């Protein structure tokens, strides 16, 4: 479900967008300098989340997003959600499927029409990093990959590898990329 996917990704997208000195600003940004961090701090203050300084208020804003997810029974990570929604598969099985799909998912996200309006224009490897952080959670991601911002992308050789959750698409002469 779209809303659940947004909730699972939101804290990690906010952390990515909060960069004060990004390599690339959004293509269609409505401002001359990065403002996402300040806006997230303002949102935190509006809902009563404060800190000793802006950095602490931002961290507390992220904690508030995580608490909202918990309050509405959305697990903390994509892996946790998949394991709850589909208990017939193990976390290891889901990890294998997710890793097989994440490069293609990252490329699709990069080419999505909405990406240019994001406050920070991401590279494909940065999108992969956001997806993997959302899949594992920050601590497990850092344990596996280190605290990196951009990961290497491997171009998928199997079009079907891009269909997580066991979804598939038929490829035929009348279809392009599996879609009519």
Spans of features found by a protein language model:
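Gly/Pro-rich interdomain helix-loop hinge
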Residues: 3-97, 116, 140, 145-149, ...
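Short, amphipathic C-terminal "tail helix"
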Residues: 95-179
């Amino acid at each position: 479900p779209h809303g659940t996917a947004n909730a699972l990704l939101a804290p990690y997208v906010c952390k990515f967008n909060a960069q004060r000195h990004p390599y690339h600003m959004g293509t269609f940004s409505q401002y001359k300098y990065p403002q996402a961090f300040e806006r997230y701090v303002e949102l935190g203050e509006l809902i009563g989340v404060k800190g000793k300084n802006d950095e602490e208020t931002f961290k507390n804003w992220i904690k508030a997003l995580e608490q909202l997810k918990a309050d509405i029974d959305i697990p903390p990570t994509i892996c946790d959600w998949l394991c709850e929604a589909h208990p017939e598969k193990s976390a290891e099985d889901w990890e294998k499927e997710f890793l097989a799909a994440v490069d293609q998912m990252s490329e699709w996200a990069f080419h999505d029409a909405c990406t240019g309006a994001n406050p920070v224009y991401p590279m494909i490897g940065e999108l992969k990093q956001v997806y993997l952080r959302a899949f594992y959670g920050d601590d497990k991601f850092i344990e596996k990959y280190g605290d990196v911002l951009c990961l290497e992308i491997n171009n998928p050789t199997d079009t079907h590898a891009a269909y997580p959750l066991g979804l598939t698409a038929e490829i035929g002469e009348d279809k392009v990329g599996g879609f009519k």
